[in-house]
Amino acid sequence: MTRKARTPKAAPVPEAVAVVEPPPPDAAPTGPRLSRLEIRNLATITQLELELGGGFCAFTGETGAGKSIIVDALGLLLGGRANHDLIRSGEKELLVTGFWGDGDESEADSASRRLSSAGRGAARLSGEVVSVRELQEWAQGRLTIHWQHSAVSLLSPANQRGLLDRRVTKEAQAYAAAHAAWREAVSRLERLQASQRERARQIDLLAFQVQEISEVSPDPGEEEGLNTELSRLSNLHTIAQAAAGGVELLSDGDLNAAGLIGEAVRALNAGAKYDETVMQLQNELRAALESVQAIAGELRDVAEGSAADPEALDRVEARLSALSKLKNKYGPTLEDVVEFGAQAAEELAGLEEDERDAGSLQADVDALHAELLKVGQALDAAREREAEPLVDSLLAVIRELGMPHARMEFALSALAEPAAYGLSDVLLRFSANPGEELGPLSDVASGGELSRVMLAVSTVLGADTPSVVFDEVDAGIGGAAAIAVAEQLSRLADTRQVLVVTHLAQIAARAHHHYKVEKQVEDGRTVSHVRLLTGDERLEEIARMLSGNTSEAALEHARELLAG
């Protein structure tokens, strides 16, 4: 069964596209905007420090000047693939840094990405080293890029469904939770329905492994101490001989250190009565004598206590052997053995729980499936309810973008089995021309039409970030449609910073800030520069974009565009 949202009637063809005054420059975005971009050694850019205004910012320049490099740089800050071919030829590394804030660099948040020709890279947030994934998560909340060909993402049924589900997040999340619970129960039931013999074999194996490890109860840190003790027990005879020899020399021998020191103490008696220095030295010798006697006593204890202990040696060797056996089977380290034992115990507990729960699990699956159908029907109802106003809003913009006869609908078709995203497929059907049947967007829309639909989506649903980048959004359009695209971009810039790479004068003329990308040859090498255009320079650039020259007629046309 296919259910379709109502398609509004086509609007009449407008005689002219009205152009309203753009919002004031630096219109406040919904959050911190991209205020500064620094690029070093990226493609044809050697060094760039670019201050970015708020509102609508346009980047223009001749083909090949390097406009796309700006977008490539921002893509790196979004955690894009590390393409080391972007590093300028002859340089060891590239660096891109973006600052988000009100223009005060000292108080701005920053993100940077460094790539080296050696294949290494680094990402930082406000100076702190982070992973590329952390950089990506941070930047995705601040910057969105609509790449030159990203409009093709609208061809994906999942993305088409996502447009609608952004308006039914509560119902979509409830369905996702219900589906996850149902699938988990189904998976457990399927495990139970597997071969009883195989499950019993697995339980026996896991039980043996858990018992074998638990009986030894290995401690990952015990091997070092055991090896030290093994070395001591294996050399008790040598230890006893060494200690006895020390005792002989210190106190027990015919000529020993204690005796000689004692004689020295006595020899100093006469002089110590009359000289304080001699007395001090005599006292030090007495202390040395006490120390030697104490050491001799301890060595005597060592010698007497170092008798062979074969039982202790056997215990240590047996413990090391047991640990070695476990490492050979479950290692290679004791840490691995302990981890294996924990995982085996967890898996064993799960299998044993499955055995106990076999009687009630089918009932759980049935109940969860019934709940899933209920929640799925609520999701379909919400999608149908929201589809019509969303289509109305999208078509209102699309028709202003030079497609006055455009029609559109979200078609829901029931699935044979519940999917992770719902009980129905969602397909965006579209027609740009009168008399043509609605068809899948992927089959009937041209590249230019896709770009305008994407722009309508961005305007109606809004970008999720305070800064939005459009790379060649104007591909395949001109004339009144170009003016309409400029108007929509200007509207989007009311609440967000909008950065647009464009080749159309109609769009560049509506920008609050106009940047030109130029390519020059310096010292025999191509270098790209970016500068902010104002006054006559901007007028001449608009004229060049219109006519390829700065004739008086082109300049007059440019003045008209800039005047609005």
UniProtKB/Swiss-Prot annotation:
Belongs to the RecN family. Keywords: ATP-binding, DNA damage, DNA repair, Nucleotide-binding. May be involved in recombinational repair of damaged DNA. ATP binds at residues 61-68. The keyword DNA repair applies. It comes from Deinococcus radiodurans (strain ATCC 13939 / DSM 20539 / JCM 16871 / CCUG 27074 / LMG 4051 / NBRC 15346 / NCIMB 9279 / VKM B-1422 / R1). InterPro entries: DNA_recomb/repair_RecN (IPR004604), P-loop_NTPase (IPR027417), RecF/RecN/SMC_N (IPR003395). This is DNA repair protein RecN. Residues 10-20 have a biased composition (Low complexity). One of its GO terms (molecular function) is ATP binding. One of its GO terms (biological process) is SOS response. It holds the Pfam family SMC_N. The keyword Iron-sulfur does not apply. Residues 1-32 are annotated as: Disordered. GO terms for cellular component: bacterial nucleoid.
